[in-house]
Amino acid sequence: MAGIFEDDKSVVRDMEKKTPIVVPVLVIGFNRPDILRQCIAKLRESKPQNMYFACDGARADKEGEDAVIREVRSVMENDIDWPCEKHYRYNERNKGCEVTESEAISWVLSENEYIIVVEDDIIAPYSFLKFAQEMLYLYKDAENVYMISSNNQTPMPLPNNEDYCFSNYGHIWAVSYTHLRAH
């Protein structure tokens, strides 16, 4: 008996194809080179085409932190071994997490309409990057969508077995749009 598909092998091949991640991915790191390596190793599986990196400067009162920061920056510059655009923003002095992240996001959004933000301790699988990219495109003109986040604070399933939902609560790890930075 013939299968549903004339050529089952072509269906499998199509399922194995990955949608390229073309939305810029911003990786924000600080003083955890080993954790950053894990983050980049996971991103390597997705091979985003446009990578941005930001790193704060060492704190003056933390002896030896400048060497750790140099190592983090080396990881950012040398562990990306797939073809992609690479952009770097490094603070010469420490500005703190809030300022560094805000400035880095503004920097990327000054050059791009969309952004996916990944902090160094986020291990973002391809499924999240693809989801984020698809949602950015889908909701780009929705004025009631301020951010897209991979977050689940409740163990209960979503109604109707939905894959995602709208919430009145934001979560800081997310993606965003240029036009919303003004709000």
Indicate residue ranges for each PLM-predicted region.
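N-proximal low-complexity "stem/linker" segments adjacent to membrane-targeting elements
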Residues: 2-41
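Acidic donor-binding segment of Leloir-type glycosyltransferases
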Residues: 46-87
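A short, glycine-/small-residue-rich helix N-cap motif at loop->alpha-helix starts
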Residues: 92-100
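Active-site nucleotide-sugar/metal-binding loop of Leloir-type enzymes
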Residues: 102-114
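Short beta-strand-to-loop acidic/aromatic patch adjacent to the donor-nucleotide binding site
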Residues: 113-123
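Conserved donor NDP-sugar-binding/catalytic core segment of glycosyltransferases
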Residues: 129-161
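Short glycine- and hydrophobic/aromatic-rich loop-to-beta-strand nucleating segment
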Residues: 171-175
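Conserved small/polar residues in nucleotide/adenosyl-binding loops
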Residues: 178-183
